[in-house]
UniProtKB/Swiss-Prot annotation:
Feature: compositional bias, Pro residues: 361-371, 898-910, 925-939
Protein name from the UniProt record: Protein PIP82
Low complexity bias locations: 1-10, 109-118, 351-360, 940-968, 1114-1149, 1179-1195
Function of the molecule: Required for the morphological differentiation and maintenance of the rhabdomeric photoreceptor apical domain. Acts as a downstream component of the gl and Pph13 transcriptional pathway which is required for photoreceptor cell development. Likely to function by regulating the trafficking or retention of rhabdomeric proteins including the phototransduction proteins ninaE and didum.
Residue span of region Disordered: 1-55, 85-132, 291-471, 493-515, 544-567, 613-637, 702-771, 833-977, 1060-1195
Source organism, top-level taxon: Eukaryota
UniProt source species: Drosophila melanogaster (Fruit fly)
Keyword Cytoplasm applies: yes
Keywords annotated in UniProt: Cell projection, Cytoplasm
Effect of gene knockout: Viable however, rhabdomeres are flat and oblong, and alignment or organization of the microvillar projections along the depth of the retina are not maintained. Severity of the phenotype increases with age, by seven days post-eclosion rhabdomeres have become irregular, misaligned and fragmented structures. The phototransduction proteins ninaE and, to a much lesser extent, didum are displaced from vesicles near the rhabdomere terminal web and instead become mislocalized to the basal lateral membranes.
Tagged with keyword Cytoplasm: yes
Biased segments, Basic and acidic residues type: 37-50, 300-313, 494-505, 1086-1095
Domain observations: The phospho-regulated basic and hydrophobic (PRBH) motif is sufficient and important for interaction with phospholipids permitting cortical localization. Phosphorylation of the PRBH motif by aPKC inhibits the association of the protein with the cortical membrane.
Length: 1195
């Protein structure tokens, strides 16, 4: 066993193989031990148990453990005696099991401890492994234990007995990993309390052999410690750490489980809310509503009104769908919207007819007969509204002169009056409701019903503001009722519809208000804009939902704007409860809406129009200015700012109810779950990135969304359903640009108009430069522009977004947003991104914009738009940082921003020992070395993992590197840019936070830096061969500095890692490392020979550090992945390293892939890896997560 153990000493470094070997060893040892055990199985168990008990207080452990079961498992558990690199889990679990079983035996079979000391030694080794629950860095001690295992098996057994908690537990990685141990651990998965060895000895002292064993075991321990200093170190450090960690682990697990439970509860709660909302949507159906509300006369009355509004009143219909949207962009709303929109298109034809009829104010009968009667009611009642004359005039005036600023001003004046009145009413009604409404927010369907009802009631009762009074009365009554939430939604939204619809219109919660008001306004404007709207609605179908609010907002905001906004009709369509009728209903709305304009909806419309003029002010800033409403919107902006604040409050109280189609109306989903972010997801084989751009904080997302609705029907569309439409928009970006293109020209000016390139940069930049993508992103950018213009929300900080690759699926979204929060807090970093215009693009103003855009532009070049975008942005940020820190290197054209500082490869671990180790490998390899070109293909093989693009161009290393790096960025981008992903995958859950902190600290929350390194690597590979001299000269300054930093940082790792690797020549990883290291060494030699080579080496260092960083894998395995490819390129470039570097590169390329796999598996599997390499790994990451020491250097 000692021989095997010695072999396994080497394997520990090569974990991948090592595991297999460990399993084998487990079998072998288990056979020998089983023989011994079979002879003295019971005595051994009892003695072993006694020893274990003596060494540790297993009675405590036994309390938790099924001693008998453990005893049964002990023979198996003890089989692997401190197999060096078995998982710490294995060892610890078996140790726990063994020690627990032993503890049980100690308790139950202490009398059995008579003889069998030798056998007990073996058993104790396993048992002690079981005893040792520590999962901390037992790997090293495990390696040493493997080295000494055969020799010190008895010693170890004794040691384990005397010091089960100290080394022995650390010694056998089995404990945690071994299956029986795992089974035992299943009962108490974290770890039984690790009692100090002394305590255990004292506790087990009752057992005679236990005491003797303890003394003997202690002697053995001391001997073993003397044998292995590593063990002693780890025993001491780990002994304490192990116990502490185990306890902490228990706490951690409990906490983790609690967190999981809480998360699960929250998730279930959200799901329930969604389900409730969805159910409410179902209830929203006329029949269901009737059934539901028949009991409640008021509710039923409201429902009837709502149903009427749904059936007859476009506004009612309009109002209700926004509520579903509010509820949450749930599947029904988002997906059915698509399903319904074709009917909407068909309805649009009806709408055209209706729009034609709309001037007549005769509702087209195609909708339920109620529309006509309802419209008639509206016609009858609307005249009664005090504001009716003004608003109908304005609405008609706007219908007639939609683009006249005069009418806008008039409307603004009347609207301001009505808005203020309505807001006053709204405040009165909302003050209570806001509280209730938060509750009511869940059953938004009621609010839908009420939304529809309010529309209907508005139009019907609007003539008599008494509807508001009635609603208030109802609210008061309902407030007293337990059904207050539902009734409140109904009554409050009825009351709020006139009032808050104004606010909603303001808050782009105008879904319902837009339905009524927008429908009214749209009715008049539909005639004028209906053809455009129909055309564009077809185009904007995707955005109809999104634009619906916007459309409502647009239609309400400026009737003038409505002309320009196709989405208005869409908004009506979308807002229509049926979504089918939206066009015909909207046409009805056109008919009835003109009348409705004169209805109390006028007050809502005025409030809304004013609010929306504010939105329009954004829109008008961009669009309204065209319409001459900018003067009005100027006033409306101040007023809207106030009302938006109030609306935000209202929405905060009831996110779902407050805004019909505001992203907040999306309720928590868009508002809370998403900070109002543009999520751009691109998934390619090589690379999946989610580019999340935080547009606004949650709170501001309401009003920003609203404003964005005001901004453009299309941009508003994005905001309204912002989360869903954003994605959808990006998906249908070309369509949106198509459909939005009428608005898009405005959008484009809006984007440009948005003074902050910061906004434009992330969202706008991407959006603006690529038109299709621009349309995809434009809504956000325009939204941001609107936000920035109207709201004082810190658009630069908030929106200066970190485009985050969310590779971490579970926490990715939330973590990414947390990063956004940090980034928003750290706006300077984002602004630095603006500085990064120095990067490839000199667009400092549109820095992030150009950067994002440039990235996106490059993405087609690279062929991985997401990858390119991510890498490019990261390049931009990194180049930005480089620009900051390396202004000297601010020659973006000469050197790609990512290239500007070639990522310092992890200091190439090229220990002389490794070089010797590799030469034997190279002995076979030398022939390939002459083939410098073939080695580059291996490097390409290495690169293939990164990007298996051009393996053939090794000789042209510039070409090969370039092509390789071009295709290569894909996976490296993922690896490098997905530090957190890799960390999440490979870091123990407890360490994720630390890793993220490290990453964030050095990344500045910019995972993209890694992809940028890939680009820099790419550029270096490409440019260094070509521009190597000039570019490398520049880069060398950084590289030298960075290399110093890297060397200063990583030399320890280098020394530590490489010597280990060199020592462990048996391991493939070692060989890979040796090969890659030797290739690095040879490359280093080449580099030494050539400054290009040296700069390349620096690049290698950076790349290596990037790679090791990106691949969470240990630094050891890193060289194979990235360094190997870089060395291969280096070898290709400077074949001065003849055979060794070339062939090593080939081998490394192959080994690299294998090593990546093994390292990935190791990192994911390995607690040992962390325990063992965690220090090195962390040091790397403290360097590399910083963007490889380059961050340290740059920053």
């Amino acid at each position: 066993m000692s021989h095997q153990e010695q072999q396994f000493q080497h394997y520990p470094h090569h974990q991948h193989h090592h595991h297999h070997h460990h399993h084998h060893i487990h079998q072998v040892q288990s056979e020998t031990q089983l023989e011994q055990r079979s002879s003295d199985l019971e005595p051994n168990r009892s003695r072993n148990t006694d020893r274990i008990g003596s060494s540790m207080d297993f009675r405590n452990l036994c309390q938790r453990i099924d001693v008998d079961g453990l005893k049964a498992k002990l023979p198996q558990l003890k089989l692997p005696k401190s197999l060096p690199k078995l998982r710490g889990r294995k060892i610890f679990r078996s140790s726990k099991s063994g020690s627990n079983a032993a503890g049980g035996g100690t308790a139950g079979g202490s009398a059995k401890d008579g003889a069998g000391a030798a056998q007990q030694t073996h058993l104790q080794v396993a048992g002690q492994s079981q005893q040792f629950i520590n999962r901390t860095p037992q790997r090293i001690s495990t390696i040493s234990s493997l080295m000494y295992e055969g020799e010190q098996e008895e010693i170890r057994a004794n040691l384990g007995q005397s010091q089960p908690g100290t080394y022995r537990s650390a010694g056998s990685l089995d404990d945690d990993y071994y299956a029986p141990g795992s089974g035992d651990r299943a009962s108490r998965p974290i770890s039984p309390i690790k009692i100090p060895v002394v305590g255990a000895l004292d506790d087990s002292s009752p057992s005679e052999n236990g005491n003797v064993r303890t003394t003997f075991t202690q002697r053995l321990q001391r001997g073993y410690k003397s044998l292995s200093e590593l063990r002693i170190k780890h025993i001491f450090a780990k002994q304490t750490t192990v116990r502490r960690d185990n306890i902490e682990v228990d706490r951690y697990v409990e906490q983790y489980e609690r967190e999981l439970k809480s998360e699960k509860l929250a998730r279930e709660r959200r799901d329930r809310e969604i389900a409730e909302n969805y159910d409410i949507k179902i209830k929203t159906l006329a029949g269901t509503r009737q059934n539901t509300f028949d009991d409640d006369d008021v509710e039923h009355e409201q429902f009837e009104r709502g149903k009427i509004s749904h059936e007859t009143d476009e506004s009612g219909m309009e109002a209700t769908p926004p509520l579903p949207s509010r509820r949450k962009p749930g599947i029904a709303a988002t997906r059915f919207a698509k399903v319904r929109k074709p009917p909407l298109e068909m309805e649009e034809e009806q709408q055209q007819a209706a729009a034609e009829e709309s001037p007549q104010a005769n509702p087209p009968p195609p909708p339920p007969p109620r529309p006509s009667s309802y419209k008639q009611l509206l016609i009858n009642k609307l005249p009664h509204l005090p504001s009716l004359p003004n608003l109908p005039q304005f609405s008609r005036t706007k219908e007639e002169t939609t683009k006249t600023a005069e009418n806008a001003d008039e409307n603004n004046a009347s609207r301001k009056l009505s808005i203020r009145q309505n807001i006053k009413r709204l405040r009165k009604s909302i003050k209570r409701p806001s509280k209730i409404k938060s509750k009511a927010a869940a059953p938004v369907p009621d609010s839908d019903e009420e939304e529809a009802t309010p529309d209907g009631q508005k139009t019907k009762d609007a003539p008599t503001r008494s509807s508001t009074a009635n609603l208030r009365a109802r609210l008061s009554r309902f407030a007293s009722t337990e059904q207050l939430q539902q009734r409140w939604r109904k009554s409050f939204k009825v009351a709020k519809e006139p009032e808050e619809l104004e606010t909603k219109a303001e808050g782009s919660a105008t879904g319902g208000a837009s339905g009524v008001l927008g429908g009214l306004l749209v009715g008049s404007q539909l005639e004028k804009t209906l053809a455009k709207l129909n055309e564009k609605v077809h185009q904007l179908k995707f955005f109809q939902r999104n634009a619906n609010n916007q459309n409502a907002t647009t239609s309400k905001q400026p009737k003038p704007n409505t002309v320009g906004h196709e989405p208005i009709e869409i908004d009506d369509d979308e807002l229509e409860a049926t979504y089918h009728r939206s066009d015909s209903l909207e046409a009805e709305n056109g008919n009835g809406n003109e009348n409705d304009d004169s209805g109390e909806d006028i007050s809502a419309e005025e409030a809304f129009g004013q609010i929306q003029e504010e939105d329009n002010e954004e829109d008008h800033s961009q669009d309204q200015t065209k319409r001459g409403q900018s003067s009005v919107s100027g006033i409306a902006t101040a007023h809207a700012a106030r009302q938006m604040a109030k609306l935000a409050e209202i929405q905060a109280a009831s996110k779902s109810g407050a805004a019909a189609w505001s992203s907040e109306s999306l309720e928590e989903i868009a508002d809370e779950d998403y900070p109002r972010v543009l999520i751009h997801q691109e998934h390619s084989d090589a690379y999946e990135s989610t580019l999340i751009i935080a547009v606004a904080s949650k709170g501001s997302s309401m009003s920003p969304v609203v404003r964005s609705s005001g901004l453009k029907s299309s941009p508003a569309a994005g905001p309204k359903t912002s989360p869903h439409p954003e994605i959808r928009i990006s998906a249908s970006g070309p369509q949106k640009s198509m459909s939005y293109s009428p608005g898009n020209p405005r959008g484009e000016p809006v984007t440009k108009r948005s003074p902050s390139p910061e906004f434009k940069t992330p969202a706008g930049g991407n959006k603006i430069v690529p038109k299709s993508e621009t349309s995809a992103w434009l809504p956000n950018e325009q939204i941001i522009a609107g936000f920035k213009e109207q709201t004082s929300w810190p658009a630069p900080a908030l929106y200066k977004p970190k485009s985050i690759d969310i590779f971490e699926a579970s926490a990715g979204g939330s973590a990414a947003f947390a990063d956004f929060d940090e980034a928003l807090r750290n706006a300077p970093v984002l602004r630095i991104s603006a500085g990064s215009s120095i990067d490839t693009s000199g667009e400092e103003a549109d820095d992030s914009c150009s950067r994002v855009t440039r990235i996106r532009v490059q993405s087609p070049q690279i062929g991985n738009s997401r990858e390119s975008l991510m890498a490019q942005e990261e390049e931009d940020k990194e180049a930005e940082r480089d620009s900051e820190e390396e202004e000297e290197e601010r020659d973006p054209s000469e050197r790609p921003p990512s290239e500007s500082p070639p990522p310092p490869p992890l200091p190439q671990r090229r220990p002389p020992t490794k070089r010797p180790a590799t030469p034997p490998i190279y002995d076979a390899v030398p022939p390939p070395l002459p083939v410098s070109k073939p080695p580059p293909p291996p490097s390409v093989e290495t690169i293939p993992s990164v990007a298996s693009l051009p393996s053939p161009a090794p000789v042209t290393r510039s070409m090969a590197q370039r092509s390789a790096s071009m295709s290569r960025p894909a996976k490296p981008l993922v690896k490098t840019s997905s530090l957190r992903l890799t960390y999440n995958e490979q870091v123990r859950p407890g360490d994720v936070g630390k890793v993220n902190k490290l990453i964030s600290r050095f990344e500045g929350g910019r995972p993209r830096l890694c992809p940028r390194r890939m680009h820099s690597e790419e550029y270096e590979r490409c440019a260094q061969p070509e521009d190597e001299e000039p570019e490398m000269e520049q880069i060398l300054e950084l590289q030298i500095i960075e290399r110093r930093a890297v060397d200063s940082v990583t030399p320890t790792n280098r020394a530590v890692v490489i010597p280990q690797i060199t020592v462990n020549n048996n391991n493939n990883n070692e060989r890979q490392l040796e090969q890659s290291d030797q290739s690095d060494q040879s490359a280093h030699q080449e580099i030494t020979d050539t400054r290009k080579t040296k700069s390349m080496e620096l690049a290698l260092d950076r790349q290596n550090s990037n790679c090791s960083r990106s691949e969470y894998g240990s630094p050891l395995s890193f060289p194979s992945s990235r360094r190997s490819s870089t060395p291969t390129n280096l070898n290709a470039n400077s074949n001065s390293n003849p055979n060794p570097s070339t062939n090593p590169n080939q081998n490394p390329s192959q080994i690299l892939q294998h090593q990546r796999r093994s390292r990935r598996s190791m990192t994911r599997d390995d607690d040992n890896f962390y325990s063992f390499d965690s220090d090195e790994e962390n040091s790397y990451y403290s360097i590399s997560p910083s963007g490889s020491s380059r961050y340290v250097v740059e920053i």
